[in-house]
Each structure stands twice: as structure tokens, then as C-alpha cells.
Amino acid sequence: MEEFEEFRRKGEMSSRCGNHRVLRKWNSCACELAVPFEVPEHAITKLHIYDFDNTLFATPGPTEQLYTRELLNLLTSSTLPNGGWWNEPGFLQAAIEISKTKPRRYSWNADIVKLAEESYSAKDTISIVLTGREESKFHKLIEHALQTARSHWKCSENEFRFNAVCLKKRAISEYTSKYKKELMRDFLEYYPSLRELSIYDDRIHQIDAFKSFFHSLDLPRLKWSAIPVRPFTKSLPREQELEMVMDMVRKNNSQALSTSQKFDLRRTPRQIGYILCTASHRLLSIEVIKYLKRRKGRRTFRPKLYEHPLYIPCAEPGKDIPALEIAKVWSNNDTRTFDSEKKVQHISQIFYLEQPGKCIVHFQVTDLAVIASAHHNRRKPLEVYFKATPEPNRYTFTLFPEYIVTGHFYKRDRIEDLEVVTERLINCKEDIHWVPLDNTIPIKAFFGRFAKLAAIPCSNA
């Protein structure tokens, strides 16, 4: 509280001194401060605020398909001794290094960059970057990201600039939303001439909080906009991400004060099949919600449609399919590619070594089945299945009677519903009663295999 009062007193002094001192008060990156000395304070009529992570810059988050939901929640938990994924500078640092070798649009949101440049060039506008990342840990890194971008793009002195770059000062609040609202309140008090305030953010709950904040202000003069931005993200290379996660877990275990905070990593059983892309997973999730809304007497709710990814199994988890069938699917039954045992084994090696993504297979989803869970699991009240048909003239293979889209829930490194789902797939003609969809849904899948990383109790605990 004393730190906060001191911060407020500095703000009051800044207000009396003039020269846009509020920018100095909140700015976190000395090299990024650009005070518009040539513009009188009373001439500032607009404040434009840009979030950094996934709004302006493609900050990498954990790749959902790589981890069980339990582990994903652990990795992103701020209660871990090292603060979790979002408090670990290494992931952001890795993304910045990758950005040096990529086109501008790969790592930076071109639409937001354009808006930011227009904001900075407008004489009546103050433009700032505002992020909930902690100032003490990340200010140099975000400064480095901006400077790297300008150097890589060969920007002029006034291109891709902001008046200030503001990170979270823990003296104000440890909560990002509250911190951002305090900053906006201070700017509104400092610049009574403000007539417009626009804030861009990728998180809907933040946008909703800002709208509530603006509604609570008694400022009829102010035209405000809380603008949701589609999350802009890029994953790190898979092997690099996994290596960094393992290192993060080792650090966590070395810093943990209690054994309950320690955990090891282990793989779930390997699964082989046609792995749905994220967009197709989303389409099928929406279809389930629409179906449940139509069901008479059932209140609408949003089921957790398994864990990523949904897939069409070729075999029971933990089991393989014949190498010849792998070669046939991989080559779309081009006999020239598997006319010898050596060629078959070569394709099989590629299949098991490479990440899914090279072999694309399209399906049409025609039917849906929603079944009450066999063991009435609270986390999984329903089992959901989709019947799929491969595209014409495309060789496909499965050990099951039909091509069925499904998924799993995981408990530690075990597939929690393995027996139930496998039994359904084997006896699908008798056990599953299909409901035809109004319209078929085209989906995109990758022929491949995957296993998730899971958290298990630490063996040294």
C-alpha cells in the first residue's frame, strides 16, 4: 500500500510539472519512451492502447495437442514456484529469435502494426503498448522485441514506435485487468482533453472488464472502444518447445518447497490415425453444441469435447498397424513407392520419425452420435462420435469397421476411457445409433501418430 501511495504522489507531481510526465510515470522501457514535446498536453484528444501478447506479437503458448489437459493446466499455472509458462522468459525469447528469420507477418500482427503506426503519426494521439507482463522480469525482453523488429524491417526513426511501453508494476496491482484500468484512469485524469480511448486486446474476459470499467466512468465527453482482436499466435518448433518444457519442469522441481508441487513427465500410449486439424476440431465441437440445443427438454451446456486432438483411430492406442498399410496410405496406394520391403520399411521409418502434417487426408462427416457416458464420469457426461467417409480416390485404412472421429480424456499418463471407447469402435454397428447431420461437414486430417506428455507424481518425492 505504501508503494502504491508513493506511486500516486509521483503521478500528482508529474501532473503539476506538465510535459506529458504521465508517460514517464508509467513507461517501463527507457529506450522506447517517445514524449511528444512539440504537442501541448491540451491538444491530446485520443489515447490508443495496444496489448502485446497475441494482439501485437505472436507470443507462443503451449501447443495443446502435446500435453494432457492436467499437464497443460500445471504448465500455465502461476502458482508454480517459477511462475509457470507465462512467467518464463525463455519462451518469449525463443519467439523473438525466430522472428529475426521470418517475414514481418509471421511474428507481428500486420493489421495491428498498421493501426499502431497510424496512432503514433497522429499529432493529437498518445499510443502505448500495455501488457500484464511483470516489469522487473520482462521490460528488457519486450524492448528487445521491438528493437529487433525495427532493425529487421529496416524502419526509419519514426516507424513502428509508441509513446510508451508499459509493463505491470507490482506496486500497483498483481492483477493485469486492475493494473490496466488504473493506468487508463490516470491518463484520463492527466489529459482532461481526451475525447477518445481505444484499447485492443485478444482476451475476451479482459475486453468485458474494460467495457464494465468504461460504463462505470462518469465521463460523457469520452468516446471509448474496447476492441477484441483475434488471438495471434505461433507455436514454437515442436522439439524446441518440448525441450524447454522439460527444462522448465526440472527448474520447478528444484525450486519447489513441498513434494506436492513436484512432478515428472511421462508419455501416454501412442495413438495412430487421422488427426484432425484445429479448425476441424472446432467445427465438430460447434456441431455438438447445436445438436444439444435442439434436443427437447435438455438445457444447453458446453461439453468438453475430449482433449485435443480429435482423431479417426486406425488401431487401438498402444498398438501399431502393418507397415505395408502405412506405406499405402502415405503414398495413396502408389505401388511404385512400396514395391520392395526396403521401400516399405523406409516409408514406415519416415512415418514414425516425422511429425504429423505431411500426409493430408480429407473426410466428409455425415452422422453424429451422443451417448450417455458408460461410467457416468463427471468430467465426461457424454460420449461423442462422428461417422466419416474418406474422400473419393483416396486410399485409407483402419482396423475398425468404420471411420469414426473420437477422442479421449487422460488421467495422468493413462487414457481414462480407453476400454469404453475401444469397445464402442469395435462394435460400432450395434452399439452406436447415428443421427444424420443436416449437412455434411468436410474435415481435414493428417495421417500420423501422437502421444501426449502427462504429469505424474515425482519419483523422487
UniProtKB/Swiss-Prot annotation:
Family matches, as PANTHER family: AER281CP, RRNA 2-O-METHYLTRANSFERASE FIBRILLARIN
Top-rank taxon, per record: Eukaryota
Signal peptide residues on this chain, from the entry's feature table: none
GO biological process: box C/D sno(s)RNA 3'-end processing; rRNA methylation
Protein name stated in the entry: Uncharacterized protein YMR265C
InterPro entries cross-referenced by the UniProt entry: SAK_HAD (IPR018812), YMR265C_C (IPR056904)
Gene Ontology CC: box C/D methylation guide snoRNP complex; nucleolus; small-subunit processome
Molecular-function GO term, any one: rRNA methyltransferase activity
